[in-house]
Swiss-Prot record:
One of its GO terms (biological process) is GPI anchor biosynthetic process. Part of the glycosylphosphatidylinositol-mannosyltransferase I complex that is composed of PIGM and PIGX. Pathway: Glycolipid biosynthesis; glycosylphosphatidylinositol-anchor biosynthesis. GO terms for molecular function: glycolipid 1,4-alpha-mannosyltransferase activity. Its EC number is 2.4.1.-. GO terms for cellular component: endoplasmic reticulum membrane; glycosylphosphatidylinositol-mannosyltransferase I complex. This is GPI alpha-1,4-mannosyltransferase I, catalytic subunit. Pfam families: Mannosyl_trans. Residues 35-88, 136-168, 246-285, 349-355, 404-419 are lumenal. Keywords: Endoplasmic reticulum, Glycosyltransferase, GPI-anchor biosynthesis, Membrane, Transferase, Transmembrane, Transmembrane helix. Catalytic subunit of the glycosylphosphatidylinositol-mannosyltransferase I complex which catalyzes the transfer of the first mannose, via an alpha-1,4 bond from a dolichol-phosphate-mannose (Dol-P-Man) to the glucosaminyl acyl phosphatidylinositol (GlcN-(acyl)PI) intermediate to generate alpha-D-Man-(1->4)-alpha-D-GlcN-(1->6)-(1-radyl,2-acyl-sn-glycero-3-phospho)-2-acyl-inositol and participates in the sixth step of the glycosylphosphatidylinositol-anchor biosynthesis. It comes from Xenopus tropicalis (Western clawed frog). Its main location: endoplasmic reticulum. The chain crosses the membrane at residues 14-34, 89-111, 115-135, 169-189, 225-245, 286-306, 328-348, 356-376, 383-403.
Length: 419
């Protein structure tokens, strides 16, 4: 037993853990080259070819949006121009390094929250999770977002407002979903005296909801919050204005507006997909698409008020709810909340049996969805109804998992000092 503990201790040392994780991901990248050249099913993500083509257009002095289906900020194509000048593997190795940087940030955040002894273990859960390993090595850019989101949490937790706000503005520019974190971040800054002192306690005890709401608005106008919102807003606005100046309306349309009206009728776990598919030619389809955001907004608002004191947990719930109830839900979106899961796990008071059952349920629900999706994609059979039913089951299981996590989580609101 002691020998096994010694082996685990060695394994969890950073000088062993990080090089091993890098080696495994690099091996997957090289295997991907072999598979792409020799097998019918390709390893490299289709989006990676889109990124590379967009980067090539940039090197020719034209817009990256000349590449059909490029729906991202030009900044990503700029970052990947070494794909053209150096090697096509550059982007994959960059995403692999972002995976490792995300793990490092997970470790730092956990240590700052007072979880020193087991921080390396939870860090390893991300490093050796096969899903992020495969996603980054296939050339998907989600690990970049993971680094940005974790960096925001790291700096906000340490009350480094300027750095946190700059990265937050950049993260919203890269992908719009982190904008949902603004309310819990604002409430987190006021967590020590959110309801006030004695007056606040009297308000709560008397259930004066109007006064609570007024108090909330007053505290949301504090110096720290206004500074964070201003810096992040200016960062986002400057990036947006710069790229709008360079690429015009097609930048706004492809980077932001497209995602408000997007419909993915095949590779989509969303419970809304079948409704949006059937009403695609309806005059009210745009309104229905916008209405799909309403349940998300309500749930995110409630979660913000309930769990803002534990910011990583609140952001995890935000992201899990956003992805589960989104009108478009693909497997790469799962990484948006999986990168936050190691920050939540130390507070879970759940039996191992229960945890394993939830993991099995999560994978089982995806397998159920993949069967009709395969017959639709590769056999050309009409399985839309079955895919929708599987999507409803996936939503149900995700909801059960979220409820179980909330029920078995012990809130952590460790006070952090300004630095």
């Amino acid at each position: 037993m002691m020998k096994q503990a010694g082996i685990l201790k060695i394994f969890l040392q950073h000088q062993f853990m990080f090089p091993t994780a890098f080696f495994l991901r690099s091996a997957l990248v090289l295997f991907g080259v072999y598979q792409d050249q020799t097998m019918l099913v390709k390893y490299t993500d289709v989006d990676y070819h889109v990124f590379t083509d967009a980067a090539e257009y940039l090197t020719q002095g034209v817009s990256p949006y000349k590449r059909a289906t490029y729906r991202y900020t030009p900044l990503l194509a700029w970052i990947l121009t070494p794909n053209i000048y150096v090697t096509e593997l550059y982007g994959k190795m960059l995403f692999v390094c972002c995976d490792l940087l995300a793990a490092y940030l997970i470790h730092r955040i956990l240590v700052d929250r007072g979880i020193k002894d087991s921080a390396s273990l939870y860090c390893a859960i991300w490093l050796f999770n096969p899903l992020p390993m495969v996603v980054s090595s296939r050339g998907n850019a989600e690990s970049v977002l993971a680094v940005l989101v974790l960096s925001v949490l790291y700096y906000v937790q340490k009350r480094r407002l300027i750095k946190g706000a700059l990265i937050y503005g950049l993260s919203v520019h890269m992908k719009i979903y982190p904008i949902t974190y603004i309310l819990p971040i604002a409430l987190f800054f006021q967590k020590e005296d959110f309801y006030g002192s004695q007056e606040g306690k009297r308000v709560v005890s008397n259930l004066k909801y109007i006064r609570i709401f007024r108090n909330l608005l007053q505290r949301l106008l504090s110096r720290d919050i206004l500074l964070f919102v201003t810096v992040s807003g200016v960062t986002f606005a400057l990036l947006t204005l710069f790229f709008y100046y360079r690429y015009g309306w097609e930048f706004l349309e492809n980077t932001y507006l497209y995602h408000l009206t997007r419909r993915d009728i095949r590779h989509n776990f969303s419970p809304y997909f079948y409704m949006l598919y059937l009403t695609a030619e309806n005059n009210n389809s745009f309104i229905l698409g916008l209405a799909a955001f309403f349940p998300q907004l309500v749930l995110l608002f409630v979660v913000s008020l309930a769990y803002f004191k534990d910011l990583p947990f609140c952001c995890f719930l935000h992201t899990a709810i956003f992805v589960s109830f989104n009108k478009v839900c693909t497997s790469q979106y799962f990484l948006w909340y999986l990168c936050l899961l190691p920050l939540v796990m130390p507070g879970l008071k759940m039996s191992m049996t229960n945890g394993i059952c939830l993991i099995i349920l999560w994978f089982f629900s995806q397998a159920i969805w993949l069967v009709p999706a395969y017959f639709l994609e590769f056999e050309g059979q009409n399985t839309f109804l079955y895919i929708w039913c599987a999507g409803l089951l996936f939503l149900l299981i995700n909801t059960v998992i979220i409820v179980q996590i909330i029920s078995n989580y012990q809130l952590q609101s460790k006070k952090t000092k300004k630095t």
